[in-house]
Regions:
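Active-site nucleophile and cofactor-binding loops and adjacent substrate-binding regions
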Residues: 31, 90, 184
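Conserved PLP-enzyme active-site core in the AAT-like
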Residues: 1-59, 65-70, 80, 164, ...
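Non-catalytic terminal extensions of PLP-dependent enzymes
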Residues: 9-12, 59-67, 71-85, 101-254
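PLP-dependent aminotransferase class I/II
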Residues: 86-97
Length: 254
């Protein structure tokens, strides 16, 4: 996940030979709602000959090439390829979109990362300042002076005092019009919420989120544990949904 380090460093300088890149968020792809996500693999030159086949390549064409840009495009197999793997082409639409996004913003992507880090640190400190009427303040999931583009909070103190869990907080945030943060990840943080404001949000939005978040921490526990209350679909039985796999999707012709 590159959202904090664009323009600052790269995997090669860090000593990696092969890296899986997440294209969601940092490179324009949606994260929630099932995607479409994509995770292309990048390798150093000495590993290129082992890459799965086929690879797209091009060569100069004296006749102008099929596309009229002076090149002829073709498939090729690396010298010591491991062969074709499942879904070798990846999510091609997501890759092209990410490439276009990267080319469009260029060096401005470095500023994007700077804003993402600034927003995450500001929101973290804004929440941890607390407010009157809060039943119990969360714990910092990873105590550090500075975080990168995201931070974690443990809602264990709130659970111990009034029985409200991280999941309850996430569901209640839906009533306030927010998309729920990542739940219970990483698992080393008990009752974990991972909050990632990204670079797009203004200070006013971050202040409002912090205000609403702290307000929820002081609400009637029963109101929070039975949330959401304003969404079309209320709290679902997740255990039943996991064990009874029935997919229902409305189609236009219906």
């Amino acid at each position: 996940n590159f959202n904090a380090i664009l323009g600052k460093t790269d995997p090669g300088r860090m000593g990696f030979d092969a890296v899986h890149y997440n294209l969601h968020k940092t490179f324009s792809q949606p994260h929630g709602g099932g995607g479409p996500g994509s995770g292309p693999i990048g390798v150093k030159a000495h590993l290129a000959k082992y890459l799965p086949a086929p690879l797209a390549d091009r060569e100069e064409a004296s006749d102008g090439g099929a596309t009229g840009d002076g090149y002829r495009y073709f498939w090729r197999n690396p010298e010591n390829t491991i062969g074709k793997v499942q879904q070798w082409h990846g999510n091609s639409g997501a890759v092209v979109r990410a490439w276009a996004f990267y080319r469009r913003y260029g060096r401005e992507l470095e500023r994007m990362s700077e804003h993402a880090v600034l927003n995450a640190n500001y929101l973290r400190h804004r929440i941890m300042q607390g407010a009157e009427g809060v039943h119990a303040m969360p714990l910092d999931g990873a105590p550090a002076k500075v975080v990168k583009h995201e931070f974690t909070l443990s809602m264990s103190p709130l659970k111990e005092v009034v029985g409200v869990t991280a999941k309850d907080i996430a569901k209640r945030l839906l009533d306030y019009g927010y998309m729920s943060p990542t739940l219970y990840f990483p698992m080393i943080v008990p009752e974990c919420l991972m909050i990632e404001p990204t670079e797009t949000e203004s200070k006013e939005v971050l202040d409002k989120f912090a205000e609403d978040f702290l307000k929820i921490l002081g609400e009637d526990p029963e109101l929070v544990t039975t949330a959401p209350h304003t969404t079309d679909v209320r709290r679902v039985d997740e255990v039943l949904a996991a064990r009874s796999l029935v997919l229902k999707h409305p189609f236009d012709e219906e």
